[in-house]
Amino acid sequence: EWVPLPGSLEAIALLNQAGYQIAIATNQSGLSRGYFTIDDLHAMHSKMERLLQPLGGKIDSIFFCPHTDAHACDCRKPAPGLMKEIALRYKKTNSNQPLLGVPIVGDSLRDLEAGIALGASPHLVLTGKGQKTMAKGNLPDGTQIHADLMAFTSTLLKTQA
């Protein structure tokens, strides 16, 4: 069952209220492995949306890869396929780096690599797998590190003010 990290829903709502659109790109190999069904995944997404609504937040789009590493797909992060789909959805198709300057926030190197392939600005959060990711090193140049999604949001909104 999906449980939100403390402060994450509030951070998303603050981003929405500041005019940001939120897109999620997620690897969901559990679908291919039979750990859960597409209906289960949609139920998790619906729960997220339901919990965000009273806070004034929303997820604008969710893109997921159902494949395992064994599949030779372009959508499983760190491949940039999901990010390309996001760029197309938001009509950012005018260059080889359609997400130039757009923040990519994640807790894994895979997340960051998928975004920087299209020019996104990498932001590592230390929740989830973030601590292990930071300890391994090899973060992309320019990666900013934040305690959690709320810390990222606070930093972003301060720099935009």
Identify the role of each PLM range:
Residues 38-60, 69-104, 108-161:
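Asp-based, Mg2+/Mn2+-dependent phosphohydrolase catalytic module
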Residues 27-31, 64-70:
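Short linear capping/connector segments at secondary-structure termini
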Residues 25-27, 104-105:
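Acidic beta-strand-to-loop metal/phosphate-binding motif
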